[in-house]
């Protein structure tokens, strides 16, 4: 918004600093950002004389494509977003607006977005850990985010209860994956308990035994913990 960046300019002037900014382009996520093309150019021209704002370039996030399961459809959708961003970059440069940084691509799209030779910066964050979600969404990094729980109860040979509920391991977006157990049928969570349902009997795990989960979605898990080991 124009009034927001004008306020940023006044604050920067007060503290005698220059702010580096990227304008966000809405390439299909429909969450924030300017529409591609002429609206971006118009905005740049409206703020180009702000003394304490340094325009560095553009950013976009094709997050609406991250969870697309069909590989061909995912490539097509990301291509459409990249084309909008590329056309906007070209329009700005043709009108004398320097575009130094072009930022985009996320943990669920970087393997495709990076192939377009457009982006100067990849925004992927969660993929440094890789959880169940990003593994499903095409991340190629090795999973490295796990949570250790304890078995608290064995009500039956086909059911395992752990001390891991929503307070430590959220499961409402993407379910965490129990490790080292065969024939897991499903997992469910309440506030303070995790329940693992098995397709066949397992009598080896007993109360007090450790059991590791691969985190379902790091974004809604990491902030709950003060320390990573």
Model-derived regions, located:
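Short beta->alpha connector loops
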Residues: 1-5, 107-108
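Active-site loop/helix belt of alpha/beta enzymes
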Residues: 19-20, 26-139
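Active-site loop ensemble at the mouth of alpha/beta enzyme cores that anchors a bound cofactor
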Residues: 76, 108-182
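C-terminal accessory subdomain/extension
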Residues: 155-229
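Short Gly/Pro-enriched turn/cap motifs at secondary-structure boundaries
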Residues: 81, 140-142, 184-188
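Active-site-adjacent beta->alpha loops and helix N-cap segments on the catalytic face
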Residues: 3-11, 15-16
């Amino acid at each position: 918004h124009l009034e927001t960046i004008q306020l940023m300019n006044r604050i920067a002037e007060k503290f005698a600093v220059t702010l580096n900014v990227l304008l966000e382009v809405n390439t299909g996520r429909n969450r924030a950002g300017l529409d591609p093309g002429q609206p971006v150019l118009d905005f740049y021209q409206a703020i180009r004389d702000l003394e304490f704002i340094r325009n560095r370039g553009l950013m976009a996030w094709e997050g609406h494509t991250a969870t697309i399961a069909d590989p061909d459809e995912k490539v097509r959708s990301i291509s459409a977003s990249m084309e909008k961003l590329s056309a906007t970059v070209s329009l700005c440069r043709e009108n004398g607006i320097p575009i130094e940084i072009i930022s985009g691509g996320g943990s669920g799209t970087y393997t495709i977005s990076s192939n377009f030779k457009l982006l100067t910066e990849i925004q992927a964050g969660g993929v440094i850990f890789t959880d169940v979600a990003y593994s499903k969404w095409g991340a190629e990094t090795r999973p490295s985010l796990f949570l250790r729980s304890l078995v608290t109860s064995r009500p039956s040979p086909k059911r395992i209860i752990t001390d891991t509920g929503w307070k430590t391991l959220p499961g409402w977006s993407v379910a965490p994956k129990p490790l080292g157990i065969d024939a897991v049928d499903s997992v469910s969570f309440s506030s303070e308990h995790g329940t693992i349902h098995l397709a066949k009997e397992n009598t080896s795990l007993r109360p007090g035994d450790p059991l590791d989960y691969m985190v379902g979605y790091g974004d809604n898990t990491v902030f709950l913990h003060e320390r990573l080991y």
